[in-house]
Amino acid sequence: PGGDISEPVSQATLRIVKVFWGLSSSLAYKRHFPAIDWLQSYSLYISRLQEWFSDNVSPEWNELRAKAMRVLQEEAELNEIVQLVGVDALSWKDRLTLEVARSIREDYLHQNAFDEVDTYTSLAKQFAMLRLILEYQEKGNQALDAGANLSDAVSYTHLRAHETLA
């Protein structure tokens, strides 16, 4: 059947190339391109590339990448809870995590190949964008620890409105 990668030829290929990009029909239906599932996909070259990214982009690159992956994994777990009992059952920190994950997905990972600006982004800009998104989470968590709630903060929809005006 389609999508079965457990058969011997696929397994041998995966051992040789050491990379797997799992395509997601649900992402494609949502018009999220490239429709690569970040939770199923992997590369065994990450350890080899860490030094290069640290030297050529930023020493923080690998840490930010790992944090972003944790946020996306946490989002998948939280979405299961949301489907069962609703978003109101989540703590403010969990809601913030969902907002940050949405920003990673929609603002960072999503591309429009037909848009001149979106077709290509330098590594320096990618780093700055990811750092900004994760800094939003850090500052948001600090505000929540200080007694604020997420509705007091600038919401993602307000950020979108400002982006449209800019």
Model-derived features: where do they sit?
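P-loop NTPase catalytic core
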Residues: 1-154
